[in-house]
Amino acid sequence: MSSTDTLSGQVAAADAEILLAQPRGFCAGVDRAIEIVERAIAMHGAPIYVRHEIVHNKYVVEDLKKKGAIFVEELEEVPSGNTVIFSAHGVSKAVRDEAAVRGLRIYDATCPLVTKVHVEVAKMRQEGVDIVMIGHKGHPEVEGTMGQVERGMHLVESVEDVRRLELPDPERVALVTQTTLSVDDAAEIIGALKAKFPAIREPKKQDICYATQNRQDAVKFMAPQCDVVIVVGSPNSSNSSRLREVAEKRGVAAYMVDAPEQIDPAWVAGKRRIGVTAGASAPEVLAQAVIARLRELGVTNVRALEGIEENVSFPLPRGLNLSSAA
């Protein structure tokens, strides 16, 4: 069968193969955040409240709901005396203070690499330095980082924003970035900031996290070998969206799916090489489900590409040790 409307059967080219990006899927921060929720439920019983989606992935959130997690956007939705978990994206100082004042039991699932940026911001503001943050307006990580201090933060999303930016003292300025940005886009904006503010201070180590960079590099390597790329990730996942953009910028059609049934057979019709990757918040079970769906469409071979092997882990918060959660 050759119709692109076919639900299964031979749609892809007869010799089609799947190329699997390496690395892909969960990063250490996401693994840690999910484990924090699961252990908190095991220790304290359901329900456990989580402020914002623990990570931006529908499958993960729905799975944790079944286990007893309740996701809220504001602390006022958490009844007094209950447990609240801050999502991997981090929260503002005001949210943290409110939770403490209300006497809520707090577990902080903020990714340690996001916390590193929070520490940088607080330190530089204590020194009287204005801070330019490169990030996406409205993203919870950006709101959390901007909310570490009361003033002196300036958000830019583009080179054009940099052109319009005016600061009180161009000699006392520093930059930080959202951890899930496009490495290439961030580099362009950083270049514009350096040109406009030559004295601008950069972090000793870039804020874009290792997992974001590794997954983008893997797509840069994979995309030129592919006729089409499928990214496993939810629409509200910043890092997953960046992977799709990275492939598209290399001239390859790229699509993002939350579930295998979202794959349009027309995407792979007649295609010989189909790249598959997954955002840092997307579980491997979804990537494997996508592979299974592509097999239904006639792809018989799967080839894992070479790439970086990640061996990163982060410690859990105090009180969530193995013996307590057993």
Curated annotation (Swiss-Prot):
- Residues annotated as binding [4Fe-4S] cluster: 27, 111, 209
Q: How is the cofactor bound?
A: Binds 1 [4Fe-4S] cluster per subunit.
User: In which pathway does this enzyme or protein participate?
Assistant: Isoprenoid biosynthesis; dimethylallyl diphosphate biosynthesis; dimethylallyl diphosphate from (2E)-4-hydroxy-3-methylbutenyl diphosphate: step 1/1; Isoprenoid biosynthesis; isopentenyl diphosphate biosynthesis via DXP pathway; isopentenyl diphosphate from 1-deoxy-D-xylulose 5-phosphate: step 6/6
Q: Report the InterPro entries cross-referenced here.
A: LytB/IspH
Q: Which of this chain's residues are annotated to bind (2E)-4-hydroxy-3-methylbut-2-enyl diphosphate?
A: 56, 89, 139, 179, 237-239, 281
Question: Keyword Cell division, does the record have it?
Answer: no
* The protein's Enzyme Commission number: 1.17.7.4
Kindly state which reaction or reactions the protein catalyses: isopentenyl diphosphate + 2 oxidized [2Fe-2S]-[ferredoxin] + H2O = (2E)-4-hydroxy-3-methylbut-2-enyl diphosphate + 2 reduced [2Fe-2S]-[ferredoxin] + 2 H(+); dimethylallyl diphosphate + 2 oxidized [2Fe-2S]-[ferredoxin] + H2O = (2E)-4-hydroxy-3-methylbut-2-enyl diphosphate + 2 reduced [2Fe-2S]-[ferredoxin] + 2 H(+)
User: Which molecular function term from Gene Ontology is one that the record holds?
Assistant: metal ion binding
Q: Which cofactor does it need?
A: [4Fe-4S] cluster
Residues annotated to bind isopentenyl diphosphate: 56, 89, 139, 237-239, 281
User: Could you tell me which Pfam families the record lists for this protein?
Assistant: LYTB (PF02401)
Organism's domain of life? Answer: Bacteria
Q: In the UniProt entry, which residues are flagged as the active site? A: 141
Q: Which family does it belong to?
A: Belongs to the IspH family.
Q: What does this protein do?
A: Catalyzes the conversion of 1-hydroxy-2-methyl-2-(E)-butenyl 4-diphosphate (HMBPP) into a mixture of isopentenyl diphosphate (IPP) and dimethylallyl diphosphate (DMAPP). Acts in the terminal step of the DOXP/MEP pathway for isoprenoid precursor biosynthesis.
Q: What is this protein called?
A: 4-hydroxy-3-methylbut-2-enyl diphosphate reductase 2
What is the scientific name of the source organism? Burkholderia mallei (strain ATCC 23344)
> What is the gene name?
ispH2
